[in-house]
Swiss-Prot record:
<feature type="short sequence motif" description="QXSXEXXXL">
    <location>
        <begin position="9"/>
        <end position="17"/>
    </location>
</feature>
<dbReference type="InterPro" id="IPR007166">
    <property type="entry name" value="Class3_signal_pept_motif"/>
</dbReference>
<protein>
    <recommendedName>
        <fullName>Probable pilin MJ0832.1</fullName>
    </recommendedName>
</protein>
<keyword id="KW-0281">Fimbrium</keyword>
<keyword id="KW-0964">Secreted</keyword>
<dbReference type="GO" id="GO:0009986">
    <property type="term" value="C:cell surface"/>
</dbReference>
<dbReference type="Pfam" id="PF04021">
    <property type="entry name" value="Class_IIIsignal"/>
</dbReference>
<feature type="propeptide">
    <location>
        <begin position="1"/>
        <end position="8"/>
    </location>
</feature>
<dbReference type="GO" id="GO:0005576">
    <property type="term" value="C:extracellular region"/>
</dbReference>
<dbReference type="GO" id="GO:0016020">
    <property type="term" value="C:membrane"/>
</dbReference>
Length: 142
């Protein structure tokens, strides 16, 4: 008896995997083309800035809940921009061709020292120290 082999058939799992990879490639290549490369760069810069402010706020809140004199050193990936603080509001903004302003409200007053302006995308060092029940000093290094 002859057995016929069916050639050219692929499994359903492989075909779904192949279509998923193909769709991911089309989206990855098409997004900058549809919206422009500058738009993609600005969105990624704003996303990185939001993550930097969130990480800074999280660590300030962590230090503020500890005893006086507690110090923590934090490394933060940061896009170009300027850090600022007004009482208990922490903010990061950027002017120029890509403009944004990201703020976060903390439970404790913030005193910001050091080099507050970041000129190029880099990892900055933040030394966060609790000085009393109502104030935290944040010193930025690049």
């Amino acid at each position: 008896m002859l057995k016929f082999r069916k050639r050219g058939q692929i499994s359903l799992e492989f075909s779904l995997l192949f279509l998923g990879v193909l769709l991911a490639i089309v989206i990855a290549v098409g997004y900058p083309g549809m919206f422009g490369f500058n738009k993609t760069v600005s969105i990624s810069s704003m996303s990185l800035a939001h993550a930097a402010v969130s990480k800074m706020k999280q660590n300030i809140e962590l230090v503020s809940s500890a005893d006086e004199g507690t110090m923590k050193i934090v490394y933060i990936k940061c896009p170009p921009g300027t850090w600022g603080a007004n009482n208990n509001i922490l903010y990061f903004y950027r002017d120029g061709n890509i403009k944004f302003n990201i703020t976060a409200k903390c439970d404790i007053n913030i005193i910001l020292n050091g080099n507050k302006t970041v000129s190029t995308p880099k990892i900055i060092i933040a030394n966060i120290t609790k000085i009393d029940e109502t104030h935290v000093i944040v010193t930025l290094y690049q």
